[in-house]
Structure formats: C-alpha cells, structure tokens
From Swiss-Prot:
GO terms for cellular component: nucleus. The keyword Nucleus applies. Component of the TFIID complexe. TFIID is composed of TATA binding protein (TBP) and a number of TBP-associated factors (TAFs) whose MWs range from 14-217 kDa. May homodimerize to form the scaffold for the complex. Interacts with TAF4, TAF4B, TAF6B, TAF8, TAF9, TAF12B, TAF14 and TAF15B. Keywords: Activator, Nucleus, Repeat, Transcription, Transcription regulation, WD repeat. Belongs to the TAF5 family. It comes from Arabidopsis thaliana. This is Transcription initiation factor TFIID subunit 5.
Length: 669
C-alpha cells in the first residue's frame, strides 16, 4: 500500500469518527507538501477494502478483552520481576486496575468490567478495600458522572516515585510488548517522579504513591495560607516560667500525696515508689537530669512561635481551677526516650460488645463509657477505690452486676439519647460530659447533678465525635453529614459550620490556642479550619484509609493523625508537610495523646496495644536527610500489650500520668 492510499485511509477514518476538522487539516497539510497537487479523498463507504480495514481497527480498539489481556500480562511481568525492583513496579498496578475498570464501564461493557474487577480485586483489597467498595457500585457510564469519587479519580493523576532503573524497565516492557492500551492509561493517569539510587522498600509506599490533580492543586493553594500556630498570650505555662518553674522535691511530694487522695490507684503506685531502693532513686535522678538536658537542647534548636491572641471570647478561669492547673504543671514529670511512663489501664468487663467509646477525665478520677443501648455510664474511681475492688467487677453475668457491695450501682447511669452513643468526653475541669449519638444530637450532662442539661440539634445524620475546647465552654462536633460544627454551651445553634470534606467527618480536635480545629475524614484527608471565619486553611493528604484519631502537640506546631490501617502520620501545621509516618500498629488507631512537654506520643489501637513514640527526633530531620530518604519511620520506644483489650481511649494527665481504657474481648482463636 503506497503512502497516498495510507493518507486516504487515515482521512476516511477521521471522518468516520467525526474528526472532520482533523481530516481537513490533514488534507491541507498533504496539499501543501505535494506542491499544490490536489488530494483525492476516498469515499470509504464505496471502498470495501477501506471499510474492512476501518472496521477491523475499530473492533480491535473497542474489544473489551484487550483490557484484561493487557493488565494480566503487565501484572505477570511485574510479579515475576527481580525482588529488588518488584515492589516499585507493583505500584503502578492499582492505578492501572481502577482505570481499566472505569474505561470498560464508560464504554458500556458492564459484564466484562465486573468480570475484570472480580478477577483482580484481591490484589488490592488489603490497602484499598474502601475504594474498591465504592467502585463496586459503578455499573454504568452515568455512574461515572454522578459519583463524586469516580469523577475525582478520572480527573486526577497519581504521583509514583520510581528509581531510574525501575522506570527504564517499565518503559522497555511497554515498548517491547507493544502494549499501547496500558501505555495510554499509564501516560494519561500516572506521573512518575524518577530519582537516582536504590529502589525504596514497601514501607515507603505512603510517601511514594500520592494522588495529584485538581484536588491537589486546590490543596496546594489552600496550604499557602498563613496560620498562627503559636500558643496564646499570657498562658499558664508562661506564668509558671515567670514565677519560678518547678517546685522543690518536698513540695512535689505534697502534690503527689494530694493527687493520690483523689485516685486510690495512684496512691498505691506512689507508696510502692516510696518503698523502692535508693539505687532506683538514683537512676530516676539521672534520668531526670538527662531529660532536662534534652529539654534544654530542644529549646535551643526549636524556636517557639510568637504568641497569638484568641479569636474566640474565652471563658474566665476561676482562681481555684487556675491554681490547680498551676500545681499540676509544677509537679509534672519530665518524660523522654530515657524516662518513659507506664500505663494505668481501665478495663471494661461484661460489655457484650456494646461499648462504642470511652473517655477519661484530666486526672483519671472519672471514666465514662458510651454504649450501643444509648446509655452513658460514668465511674468515679475515687469512690470505687474507697469501696474496694469488689465494686469494679461483678462475679457473674447477671443483671445485678452493676450493684456494688453497699447495694448501689458502681456507676452513674445517664439516659437521654435514642440511639447508640459514639463519643463521650469530659470538660477540662471534669464537671460536664459531652456526648454525641446516632440520633443526630449532642447532649451536655452535669457530673455533679447527674442530669442532662442541654440537647443540641443541628446535624442531619449521626454525630461521630464531639470534643471540648482546651478552655471549655466551646466544643466542636463532626458527623456523617460531612460537616464539622462549632458550638458554645449557652447556645443551642451552631456558631460555625465547616463544610468541605468529601465523606464522613469521623474525628475532631482543637488546637491548643483555640483558634483552629482539625478534622479527620473517611475521604482520607485531614483539614485544619479557622474557627473565626470557618474557612479551611490546611489540607493534609497522605493517608490510605479513613482517619480515626487526631492529637495536637502542646506547642501547637505539630499534629498526629491515626487511620484505619494502623498508620500514624506526623504533620507540620505551618507547611502542611508530613514529617514522618509512624508504622507499628496492625489495626485501627483509635486514640492519640501527646505528653505534657510534647516529647512522647502515645497511641492506642484495636490491636490491643499501647505504643509510645519518640516524636522529638522525628521533628529534627534535615532537608538533606529527607531528600536522601533517611526519614525512616520511627519504631515505637515501648509497646504495652493488653489482655485482649482493644484500646478505645488514652490520655496524658497534666502531671504526665498516662491513662488508657478499653473493653475486654474474647481472644481470637
């Protein structure tokens, strides 16, 4: 076939497909290159040979089996590659898989798309189960346009980090096998970030694969906004520094004995500590000196942010509460990687899988639990300690298990919700409990009156979480309706509504200066909101699954977020950059808490462990270390396994005592 005929066939094909302007441009181009000679267009309707050629090409182009064959060959090649490069090469499989499926659905090959999806979904369920469950509902071309998740995938690109040799191996395969379909999908939906050096390991997947596109552009624009993450002016910590800092050892002993009167378990631990040998005391003194040195080094290397003014009218703190907080701060134990705490763990028994959430007051004296039967139960640990351990646990599984030795319940029962309770949290002084429920309401309870005071209505769907601000009075809530809201205790309408997440907002946390709140969502992002304007000022992208827990560092600069897969990510609020992921849990991370000075992070998980992390070293990585890939995830300093008890809640007290709570469950066989 001579070039003239080929050009005629191409023009005929373009006209058949409706690309008349392209056909016209090709005719004019050919006319110019042939020195003005006329270009004779072929009527492909009257040319059997041309019609046959066009039809065969069109059939091959629309053949749904090409997707399955192309993906299967690419998959086999990647799995059979050398172990050194296999993991990097496998990173392209998930983006190619989802776009092959959506292309098949978009072309109307529904049955072939379902067969393709079911054949290869097991390869990706471990990491992308929730995404696959959403894609499973895409069954027609109209679904691709209607479903926001599918639209975002079609418009976005995936950034994948490849070493130079892995990238060359992939290109060589695509060209040698003439895999034009796979090449087109990869070219359209994947951006490769090629670096020199050795391939990265499987533990680097979180940073190596990120979604870019219109959403990423929006996030980059938002993350350029300036935020004031410093602490408030004239804070209690500043007053403490001005008045002389820590108390003497004798004053510390008085503070510890007073704190022990409020909590029997703390009293017993203090007595045991007093019975320790002088050698142990010497070791503790050395550890304290080492910790002090570490703290001094940190103050030299990390300059604090300028103090800021509150954007909300904060409540006036009573003198008694202020003095109590200052006393706790003076007696606070300095923690570090060489001076780690133990855990005081509260275990719920006989819950019959009904415990949804739990919370601990700032000093550990009160413990609350929210249950599926719409009830809230509050235990006063000081009273229980005085009554003896018999009040804590029943000997049998009867209906009288809540009755203590004196004929009274060992807890206070709060009834008012009409659906499962998903969060219950104490106010900073411990005089109120805030609860949220599937009945779409938030309720405020008094721990002194043991009664419901206010019912807040505004959300349209179940409310997953509600948290008091660090100074009380204000609180934030988040819901299945994809919004977060800010409330004050004296008003039944929300003060602000934060909208922007693409899915459920699962958790909420206040910034220490009360000018911002952070929200974690099932859309795998964390957002930071300005409470005064209601605007989103930061979007943190990097999680692979729904975000279930959040914690702010005491200095307000860093944030930790935990997800359903067990990954914890450390974020710098000023730059919206992930400092380092913390890998170690193998199930949902339900609770996070920073120590008082911010040197340690505690995490509680459904894998029945509490882990301690040294977060100070993770925040001191240089740019050169990050560029060279030396920002390896920190291993936990210490792991505390529980007795088949998933950790629902944990928190550091103001004196740096670590409390945790969970419901015992039957161990898996």
């Amino acid at each position: 076939m001579d070039p003239e005929q080929i050009n005629e066939f191409v023009v005929g094909y373009l006209k058949k497909k409706g690309f008349s302007s392209a056909a016209k441009d090709l005719e004019s181009y050919h006319h110019q290159n042939n020195n003005g000679s006329s270009f004779t267009s072929v009527d492909y309707h009257n040319d059997p040979e041309l019609t046959k050629l066009i039809r065969s090409f069109s059939q091959q182009e629309d053949d749904p089996t090409r997707y399955r064959e192309g993906y299967s060959k690419l998959r086999s090649w990647a799995y059979n590659s050398l172990d050194l490069y296999k993991h990097e090469l496998l990173r392209v499989m998930y983006p190619v898989f989802i776009h092959c499926y959506m292309d098949l659905v978009g072309k109307g090959h529904t049955q072939e798309a379902r067969a393709f999806f079911n054949s290869f979904r097991k390869d990706h369920e471990m990491v992308h189960l929730r995404d696959l469950q959403k894609l499973e509902g895409v069954l027609s071309p109209s679904h691709l346009e209607e479903m926001e998740f599918a639209r975002s995938l079609r418009k976005s690109k995936v950034n994948i980090k490849f070493c130079q040799y892995s990238y060359e191996l992939l290109l060589q395969y695509l060209h040698s096998t003439v895999s034009t379909l796979m090449l087109g999908i990869i070219n359209e939906h994947i951006n490769f970030q090629v670096y020199s050096g050795q391939p990265t390991s499987s533990s680097d997947d979180i940073e190596a694969v990120t979604i870019v596109g219109s959403f990423q552009d929006t996030a980059n624009h938002i993350n350029q906004k300036e935020i004031q993450w410093g602490l408030l002016e004239d804070s209690l910590e500043d007053r403490l520094e001005k008045t002389g800092g820590l108390l003497s050892d004798s004053e510390k002993g008085q503070g510890e004995s007073k704190d022990g009167d409020a909590d029997d378990s703390k009293k017993r631990s203090t007595e045991i500590g007093k019975q320790g040998s002088s050698l142990k005391k010497l070791k503790k003194d050395k550890a304290g000196n080492a910790t002090a040195k570490v703290a001094r080094l940190e103050t030299i290397t990390v300059s604090p942010a300028p103090r800021v003014k509150p954007e909300l009218a904060l409540p006036v703190m009573s003198t008694d509460v202020e003095q109590s907080i200052l006393e706790d701060l003076r007696n606070r134990v300095q923690l570090s990687s060489v001076a780690m705490p133990s855990v005081s763990f509260y275990t719920f028994v006989n819950t019959h899988n009904g415990l949804n959430c739990s919370s601990i007051s700032h000093d550990g004296s009160l413990v609350a639990g929210g249950f599926s039967d719409s009830s809230i139960k509050v235990w006063d640990m000081a009273k229980i300690g005085q009554a003896g351990s018999g009040a804590l646990q029943a000997e049998n599984d009867s209906s009288d298990q809540s009755i203590g030795p004196n004929g009274r319940r060992s807890y206070t029962l709060l009834l008012g919700h009409s659906g499962p309770v998903y969060s219950a949290t104490f106010s900073p002084p411990g005089d109120f409990v805030l609860s949220s429920s599937a009945d779409t309401t938030i309720r405020l309870w008094s721990t002194k009156l043991n009664a419901n005071l206010v019912c807040y209505k505004g959300h349209n769907y179940p409310v997953w979480d509600a948290q008091f601000s660090p100074f009380g009075h204000y609180f934030a809530s988040c819901s299945h309706d994809r919004t977060a809201r800010i409330w004050s205790m004296d008003r039944i309408q929300p003060l602000r509504i934060m909208a922007g997440h693409l899915s459920d907002v699962d958790c909420v946390q206040w910034h220490p200066n009360c000018n911002y709140i952070a929200t974690g969502s099932s859309d795998k992002t964390v957002r930071l909101w300005d409470v005064q304007t209601g605007e989103c000022v930061r979007i943190f992208i990097g999680h692979r699954s729904m975000v279930l827990s959040l914690a702010m560092s005491p200095d307000g600069r860093y944030m930790a977020s935990g997800d359903e897969d067990g990954t914890i990510m450390m974020w710098d609020l000023s730059t919206a950059r992930c400092i380092t992921p913390l890998m170690g849990h193998n199930s949902c991370v339900w609770s996070l808490s920073y120590s008082g000075e911010g040197s340690l992070l505690a995490s509680g998980s459904a894998d029945c462990t509490v882990k301690l992390w040294d977060v100070t070293s993770s925040t001191k990585l240089t740019k050169a270390e990050e560029k060279n890939g030396n920002s390896n995830r920190l291993r936990s300093l210490r792991t505390f396994p529980t007795k088949s008890t998933p950790v629902h809640a944990l928190r550091f007290s103001r004196r740096n005592l670590l409390f945790a709570a969970g419901a015992i469950s039957k161990p898996a066989n």
